[in-house]
């Protein structure tokens, strides 16, 4: 293992949201330990912070049971390779960020060899597969939780866990500023604007983008001056979006695909259509009304539905304990229903104002110095 003044910190992420968390974590660790070095699996944002990625993070960005099965041989090959590489490099600590099905297996093998392990972002054990808690406690030395209801589950099982807040709540301003967002993006102040967030993975684009674009066409019939904004999380998703938009049915759709900038896009919008996942929380922290949707393979959906233990799938609804925003999933994810739900938000500003009060309270609950708290915990495990 490295000199504690220049610790080697291994990090592994599976998708765009993890890449963002990883980049913030690296920055916060460097403030406390400027000579720290980083390796593992990371995306473009982490690489921009000087991270050395041993494998292509995009190859891990798959969703759904059926989709994972198709790619399982490659995913297992990458995991075996990462474990082999890290056992050779002997990092001072391993941090798995989200992607629990991949990262916890890596952590378990490294912990067994004496390498301290941290899992950053608790799996949704409060929602489904709660029996995993005991196994996670065995696999990692410490869990860093983004939501306040999570640590007690691990403490009750004899593990170590702490609530570090959510990094988006820390980084995003409490106050709303639609005018500045529209100026930044060059969008007229007086027209209807809808944001489309079909997902950060290519597999999500395949399922959701056609439905979202069909929804946009219906909204355009209702609001001819409307514009649509779509933030592309990665170059891979941007390429796939371009392919979908080339279909004749979407010709002339007034849609602008923007590199990343999802927060600015959401703030510029009157309402947002979003695929279920971390992005729903970002929309809530932007204080924007939304409609949550999701479509996966029927087999995956049947499996998930049997296992899930909470009445909602969207993070804002789960955290608020009520259906504050509509969820139109699977067979309900039809363009007609999605368009009607978005129009309902656009045409009822009184409902939007009440929702924004709920979202402000949620923002205050989750707001902590997340990156610094996480960095402190990681360096403590590394013995620094």
From Swiss-Prot:
UniProt GO MF annotations: lipid-A-disaccharide synthase activity; phospholipid binding
Catalyses which reaction(s): a lipid X + a UDP-2-N,3-O-bis[(3R)-3-hydroxyacyl]-alpha-D-glucosamine = a lipid A disaccharide + UDP + H(+)
GO biological process, one term: lipid A biosynthetic process
Entry superkingdom: Bacteria
GO cellular component, one term: membrane
TM spans (from-to): none
EC numbers on record: 2.4.1.182
Pfam (any one): LpxB
Purpose of the protein: Condensation of UDP-2,3-diacylglucosamine and 2,3-diacylglucosamine-1-phosphate to form lipid A disaccharide, a precursor of lipid A, a phosphorylated glycolipid that anchors the lipopolysaccharide to the outer membrane of the cell.
The protein's name: Lipid-A-disaccharide synthase
Protein species of origin: Neisseria meningitidis serogroup B (strain ATCC BAA-335 / MC58)
This protein's encoding gene: lpxB
């Amino acid at each position: 293992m490295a000199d504690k003044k220049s610790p080697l910190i291994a990090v592994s992420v599976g998708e765009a949201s993890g890449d963002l968390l990883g980049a913030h974590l690296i920055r916060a660790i460097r403030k406390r330990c400027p000579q720290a070095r980083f390796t593992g699996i990371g995306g473009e944002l982490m690489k921009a912070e000087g991270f050395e990625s041993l494998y292509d993070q995009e190859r891990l960005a798959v969703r759904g049971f059926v989709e994972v099965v198709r790619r399982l041989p490659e995913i297992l090959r990458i995991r075996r390779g990462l474990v082999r590489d890290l056992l050779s490099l002997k990092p001072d600590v391993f941090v798995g960020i989200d992607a629990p099905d991949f990262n916890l297996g890596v952590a378990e093998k490294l912990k067994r060899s004496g390498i301290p392990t941290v899992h950053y972002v608790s799996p949704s054990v409060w929602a489904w597969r709660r029996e995993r808690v005991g196994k996670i406690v065995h696999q990692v030395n410490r869990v860093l939780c983004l939501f306040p209801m999570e640590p007690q589950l691990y403490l009750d099982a004899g593990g170590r866990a702490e609530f570090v807040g959510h990094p988006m709540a820390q980084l995003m301003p409490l106050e709303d500023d639609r005018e500045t967002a529209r100026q930044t993006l060059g969008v007229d102040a007086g027209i209807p604007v809808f944001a489309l967030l079909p997902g950060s993975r290519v597999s999500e684009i395949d399922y959701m983008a056609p439905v979202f674009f069909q929804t946009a066409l219906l909204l355009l019939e209702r609001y001819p001056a409307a514009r649509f904004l779509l933030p592309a999380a990665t170059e891979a998703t941007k390429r796939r979006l371009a392919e979908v938009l080339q279909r004749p049915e979407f010709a002339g759709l007034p849609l602008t695909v923007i590199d990343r900038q999802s927060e600015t896009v959401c703030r510029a919008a009157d309402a947002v259509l979003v695929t279920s996942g971390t992005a729903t929380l970002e929309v809530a922290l932007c204080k924007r009304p939304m409609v949550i949707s999701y479509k996966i393979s029927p087999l995956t959906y049947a499996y998930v539905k049997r296992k899930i233990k909470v009445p909602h799938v969207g993070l804002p609804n789960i955290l608020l304990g009520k259906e504050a925003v509509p969820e139109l999933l699977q067979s309900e994810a039809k363009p007609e229903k999605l368009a009607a739900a978005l129009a309902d938000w656009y045409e009822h500003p009184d409902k939007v104002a009440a929702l924004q009060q709920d979202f402000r309270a949620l923002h205050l609950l989750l707001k902590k110095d997340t990156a610094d708290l996480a960095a402190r915990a990681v360096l403590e495990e590394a013995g620094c």
